[in-house]
Curated annotation (Swiss-Prot):
Swiss-Prot/TrEMBL GO biological process terms: lipid A biosynthetic process
Catalysed transformations (reactions): a UDP-3-O-[(3R)-3-hydroxyacyl]-N-acetyl-alpha-D-glucosamine + H2O = a UDP-3-O-[(3R)-3-hydroxyacyl]-alpha-D-glucosamine + acetate
Gene: lpxC
Protein name as annotated: UDP-3-O-acyl-N-acetylglucosamine deacetylase
Listed transmembrane segments: none
EC number(s) on file: 3.5.1.108
Active site, renumbered: 266 (proton donor)
Amino acid sequence: MLQRTLAKSISVTGVGLHSGERVALTLHPAPENSGISFRRTDLDGEMGEQIKLTPYLINDTRLSSTIVTDKGVRVGTIEHIMSALSAYGIDNALIELNAPEIPIMDGSSLPFIYLLQDAGVVDQKAQKRFLKILKPVEIKEAGKWVRFTPYDGFKVTLTIEFDHPVFNRSSPTFEIDFAGKSYIDEIARARTFGFMHEVEMMRAHNLGLGGNLNNAIVIDDTDVLNPEGLRYPDEFVRHKILDAIGDLYIVGHPIVGAFEGYKSGHAINNALLRAVLADETAYDRVEFADSDDLPDAFHELNIRTCG
């Protein structure tokens, strides 16, 4: 299977969920083997240089996955766009933005899916590389845990736990095996969510300044405040899977393995990536030149190109 990038550049505008700032974002094609990079067009000189994404640049995980470079350049809330890039198997892209945060759009990854559909996807000449999990790797922190296990495909299983009546109406656990299920149908529409009682605390820390009922599910003491209700009965846990897929794609390759989590979040997801990369016996970087060898979970990627 070959690496892929966008067929053309494409732009969108929106608002940062936490910064509240208006953002203009452009996705560009990028050369093979260049990976996913970001560039702040509102910054000059070294501060405005391209940032090649790696798990080691995720240095702020308060409510999102945020790049913080050693020069202090920030690119916040990257998990939703990374989740969409993962769904389309985009290996190489440059993402330019003129503010410190990716726009939240409607709180899901679906607007970014539409953006990628409009741009189109093309194969490149180099072979796509996958990160294959070779042995179990687990992180446990304060009653939470995440783990990778070997698996011939890509499967995600997550369980959430919130002491609130709205979460008792659906299963706290969701599992999706991408060999038989579609990311776009099952995951992409799930929106981020938050609680009314947390708004004052968040805004005191300059977080959630752009949040509203158009880009998040808002929950009061008893119910969902959004008049349209939920997009899935179990939208909350599905959104956590959307986040996890984006967090995991920060490693730069599709993952051949199973990911499981209990009360997972951005910090522990990133810690798991770092733990895997720190143990050379835990993973291998593999290629599938023959499509017959490609795990079924990735076959759908073969139909999402326009060249």
